[in-house]
Every structure is written in structure tokens, then in C-alpha cells.
Amino acid sequence: MHAGLQFGSRFVVPPMQGMIYDYLPEHLLERVRNLGAFAGILALDKWTCNANGRQATFWKRSRERKFTVSFIDQGYCFNAGEWSFPDSPLRGVYARNDVYREVSGWESFQPWLGNIESMDEPTIWRCAEEIPTAWYGESCELERLVEILGRRRARVAELILEFRNSSRAPFPKWRDVVN
């Protein structure tokens, strides 16, 4: 890290009001209230070419039994600041298949996949305009990134299928629907 504008975030739950875990054993995953969000973040990671394994924290307030998953560290999106997109089926995925065990088909990726696919370029631009200039340098670089993200919207489902068909076989409940 070097001097300049940096990003920091708050705790998802204040330390005196709950617990935060970076790992939950498989038997506790049934107590994660938003486990389906792993499908949503997978769609985002495929769209943005997250070159790192997906990182997550699980948290709960002191008196709660259920956990909530929050996704952290998007620093390797756009191939770790290279702003290139060398796709690979196992890029940007969580290390354990059990978080994907309830994925049963394309409906499991909604509304996230639909939102990505239908996002128009002006919306992408509104998000991009929030990025500090110091983080990207030349405006032509930001323009290039927005153009690439616009084109990649149509590829996200294909990239998810590549992961589905990979040696990991992450979606045991996936069923193909034949019309």
C-alpha cells in the first residue's frame, strides 16, 4: 500500500454485540439465513473477473442463532487492478462447494444475474463515476472498463456454466429444464 485514498469499511456487527467468523463448518451452513447470496456474488465475480477466491465472513448478533454471510475483499476484481479479464472456471469462486449446494438452476441466480444482464451502460457509468480518479489514472482507462463490463453482461451465464461443468461439480442439485 502507498499513500493516497484508501477504502475501509466498518464491522458488520460491533465486536461487543456479536461474533464474526471467517469459517463455518458444513453443519452450521444450514443456519446461514442468506446462503443463496453465494449464487449472487458468483454472478458478480464472474462479471468482474475476480481473480481471487471469493472471501466471506459469517456473523451473528449475540442472542441470534442464525448467521448472515457478508462478502469481503473485492480487490482482485478486474484481475487485481490489471483491468484485464482472463476468465477461468475456478476464478472468483468460494473455496468450498457446500455453499452452492442449494443451487438448482438459473432461478437460483435471480435476481442478481438478471440485474447484471439488464443493466444499461448509463447505470454502469453512474457507478464508475464514483471511483476516485487516483484509482484509475486516465479517463480512457475508465471508459475502456465500462465498455468491457457492458459487453461482459451477456457472458456471465456462460461463465457460470463453465464453473458448473468444471471438475469441481459445484451444483449437485442443478437440474436442466427441457422445453
In which residue ranges do the predicted regions lie?
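Conserved kinase catalytic-core segment
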Residues: 20-83
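Short, structured active-site "lid" loops
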Residues: 1-16
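Short, functional N-terminal and low-complexity linear motifs
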Residues: 7-10, 23-25, 92, 113-117
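Generic structural signal for residues positioned in beta-strands
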Residues: 7-8, 53, 70, 148
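Residue-level signal for well-ordered alpha-helical segments
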Residues: 18, 24, 28-33, 101-105, ...
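C-terminal catalytic region of ATP-dependent kinase domains
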Residues: 61-179
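Bulky hydrophobic/aromatic packing residues
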Residues: 5, 9, 37, 156-160
